[in-house]
């Protein structure tokens, strides 16, 4: 019953609410956050990539960093709005690192040097936040070096990481960043950040291991520049320190929780709330990697105890190139990934759909109103020239899509693919129209749907000529293979190392797979991953499954380095054939994994 109720709750939260902008800044009164004369409380998400993407893991991407566009920002905040969220926390401002590859866009390039293009994306985030009615918690700097942080500020002056806390020159450099941000005038709205009501609070940083004296100095500096906004202490702890609670320049205290025992989440946050009651607002800034039932008990306690807010880690959003951005959590036990609204079968292992339904249920319990369900907006079909590579920009809240084709731009339309999830594949084309007839021209459109109904149709793309047929194998089984030896393993572990590819075929030297297609093979492409540089895969073809002959394929190595996650090396092989062969054998030369195979064939 509980599971059924959560799903139904999730599916009824897709309504469109007219956002009228913000009338008030968020203020504090004792231990409460206030929006005018009403208390402001929230249950919502960390959306770390809202202003800066670390998950652009397309197979041929040199590095995973890029800036979000307006579609992505709107999709993220619309997803939060549908889930009842009233506030989100983004991640920190990125800082240039010594080993950055060329083309990585960072916010802070050096002392007092800032990347205007990156801040234009933050301008857009604030503009859309005002439109959608979502407040932002913005932390200034990271304790860690994922995106560049305190060590990079110190490195600009050739000083050790610890200098960030007490060296006058390094502190002055950081203050230049704080001043630049607070005094920046939004290029879209014309509103200075210090006057933007979409900002809930400035957070001194993320998971800072800082002295209390540093917090006092930086909090005072922020307030000297901006009397409108609250200051949140970004000190890293699960049990609040006394100095944070008693510091008058700190308005909000926060804690982060990823417990091995879910009971610790309840006991630690209750202790924190007891210590802050009557003194100042308390926000659980990050929590996660616990079962759905534990999240339910935690949120019930959070609501009952008067905690101002709770933000689960974390939410990703639709990708402008189709599908979603994906993020496996390195500290989530090789189980949890960033959540994708409204939840999909691909997240079944970590109970994604029920968890997101629960988050929405409790968020709306705070606001006291559950909106009526609404159908998703129409998706946007992306340009394509091959009917095996169809993708679209997804619709926030959509659970599935129908792809339609016609031989005329005006119809009539027939169903080419039904109930397609845009969360099944990672950084791949979403649909292959296997039933399109070679040599014919087609037009395509896509419709989104959820329990409330079906959207209007997308834009129409076409005419697109269907060429040869394409067999596509995403390696989530061996059903498409004609034959194989017994040394194969479907690998779903540590997806981050493989550009978030959730299903790969793993084996070692001498292992093989054999494909057979109902026509002459014209070309093939194999997407592989190597732990270290190694010899090329071997390829053989024939008209029968006997007497296979060696054939050649060109290798394209796309190594961008191991990065922070130990990325394996992507090597893409492409071969062509004109011999009328219909069998293709692929042999491993060494330990490696295959993520996708495409075989083009025809008459």
Short names for language-model regions:
Residues 283-359, 363:
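Substrate-binding cleft of secreted/luminal carbohydrate-active enzymes
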Residues 464-493:
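Extracellular carbohydrate-recognition regions
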Residues 497-523, 570:
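Short beta-strands within extracellular/lumenal beta-sheet-rich domains
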Residues 524, 579-581, 588-603:
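Exposed low-complexity, polar/acidic, P/S/T/G-rich flexible segments that act as propeptides
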């Amino acid at each position: 019953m509980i599971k059924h109720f959560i799903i139904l709750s999730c599916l009824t939260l897709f309504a469109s609410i007219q956002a009228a902008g913000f009338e008030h800044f968020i203020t504090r009164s004792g231990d409460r956050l206030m929006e005018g004369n009403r208390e402001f409380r929230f249950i919502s998400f960390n959306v770390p990539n809202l202003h800066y993407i670390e998950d652009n893991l397309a197979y041929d991407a040199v590095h995973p960093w890029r800036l979000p566009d307006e579609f992505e920002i709107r999709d993220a905040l619309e997803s939060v709005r549908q889930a009842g969220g009233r506030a989100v926390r983004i991640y920190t401002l990125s800082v240039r690192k010594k080993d950055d590859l060329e083309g990585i866009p960072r916010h802070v390039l050096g002392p007092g040097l800032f990347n205007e293009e990156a801040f234009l994306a933050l301008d857009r985030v604030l503009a859309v936040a005002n439109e959608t009615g979502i407040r932002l918690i913005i932390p200034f700097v990271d304790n860690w070096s994922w995106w560049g942080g305190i060590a990079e500020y110190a490195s600009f002056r050739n000083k050790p990481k610890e200098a960030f806390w007490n060296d006058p020159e390094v502190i002055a450099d950081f203050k230049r960043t704080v001043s630049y941000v607070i005094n920046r005038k939004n290029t879209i709205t014309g509103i200075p950040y210090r006057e933007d009501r979409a900002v809930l609070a400035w957070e001194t940083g993320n998971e800072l291991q800082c002295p209390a004296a540093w917090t006092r100095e930086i909090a005072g500096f922020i307030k000297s520049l901006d009397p409108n906004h609250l200051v949140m202490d970004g000190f890293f702890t699960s049990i609040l320190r006394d100095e944070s609670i008693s510091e008058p320049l700190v308005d909000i205290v926060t804690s982060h929780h990823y417990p091995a025992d879910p009971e610790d989440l309840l006991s630690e946050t209750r202790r924190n709330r007891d210590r802050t009651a009557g003194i100042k607002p308390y926000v659980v800034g990050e929590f996660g990697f616990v079962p759905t039932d534990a999240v339910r008990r935690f949120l019930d306690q959070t609501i009952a105890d008067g905690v101002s807010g709770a933000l689960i880690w974390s939410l990703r959003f639709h990708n402008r190139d189709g599908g979603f951005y994906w993020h496996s959590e390195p500290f989530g036990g090789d189980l949890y990934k960033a959540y994708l609204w409204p939840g999909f079968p691909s997240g079944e292992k970590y109970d994604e759909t029920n968890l997101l339904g629960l988050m929405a249920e409790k968020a709306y319990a705070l606001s006291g109103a559950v909106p009526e369900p609404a159908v998703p907006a129409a998706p946007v079909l992306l340009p394509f020239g091959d009917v095996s590579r169809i993708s679209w920009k997804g619709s926030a809240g959509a659970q599935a899509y129908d792809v339609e084709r016609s031989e005329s731009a005006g119809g009539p339309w027939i169903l080419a693919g039904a109930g397609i999830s845009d969360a099944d594949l990672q950084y791949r084309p979403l649909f292959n129209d296997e039933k399109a007839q070679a040599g014919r021209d087609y037009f395509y459109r896509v419709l989104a749907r959820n329990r409330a109904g079906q959207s209007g149709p997308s834009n129409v793309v076409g005419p697109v000529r269907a060429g040869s047929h394409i067999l596509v194998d995403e390696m989530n089984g061996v059903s498409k293979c004609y034959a194989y030896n017994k040394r194969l393993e479907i690998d779903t572990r540590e997806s981050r190392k493989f550009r978030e590819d959730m299903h790969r075929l793993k084996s070692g030297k001498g292992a093989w797979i054999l494909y057979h297609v109902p026509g002459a093979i014209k070309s093939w492409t194999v997407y592989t991953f190597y732990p270290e540089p190694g010899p090329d895969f071997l390829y053989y073809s024939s008209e029968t499954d006997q007497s296979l002959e060696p054939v050649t394929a060109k290798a394209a190595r796309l190594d961008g380095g191991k990065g922070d996650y130990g990325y394996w090396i992507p090597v893409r092989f492409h071969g062509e054939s004109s011999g009328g062969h219909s069998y293709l054998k692929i042999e491993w030369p060494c330990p490696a994994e295959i993520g996708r195979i495409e075989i083009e064939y025809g008459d």
